[in-house]
Amino acid sequence: MATNFISYLTAGAAAMLLSACNGILSNIYDEPATDAVSEYGFVSEATTTSPGSIYIDATDYTVWTYIDFRSMTTTALDVNAPAPDSWDIAIHRYDAKTNGAEVMETGATSFYSLANVVTPAGSDYISDIWTETTIVTDMSTMMDGYLSYAGSFYNPELSKWLNVDKSSMPPIYTPSNKVYVIRLSDGTLAGVRLANYMDALGVKGYMTIEYMYPLKL
């Protein structure tokens, strides 16, 4: 009887310890929570006066999430898979690329003040660049001193929306809170702002993006 009771207490203590460790480690290593919000994509539609909202799961290092403003669709694909036929921007973790677009960071921290701080001057827009040392696909070897990367185009301007300082552990996350104007390949404009990079439980990699399309300046 006493042995069974002690075994029960030991098992309970172990379960509590494991639960606590999982909570701590999930915050450090950004593992998705099992009860995270399941509604992804275009959560609310933008109007001519107010931004809409896009919610995506960017926790997987092997996935690009493609966003199409015209059709209001999001598509998650493996980093090595061909891009969909129609898309405007894509997100990998906090990295971003565009479909032949150019991006400008503005001084506005909300869409309501955007018209007062920006003019669409061509010299301010930044195109994508090719990189083979930015898009991390495997973090499991970090403690061994190296990471795995995928070659990809990448937009350094739009990717400014969140700075991740990995010089210390855990990393320090600093959002710019800025609105980014995207000049799409057809000449129309879209605007995006990273409103949050965590879910309601504080798990990183769940991104809430405010957007306006078409954007009129």
Region annotations inferred by a language model:
Residues 1-10:
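Bacterial N-terminal signal peptides that target proteins for export
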Residues 18-20:
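C-terminal motif of bacterial Sec signal peptides marking the signal peptidase cleavage site
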Residues 22-217:
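Surface-exposed, beta-sheet-biased, low-hydrophobicity segments with strongly acidic/polar composition
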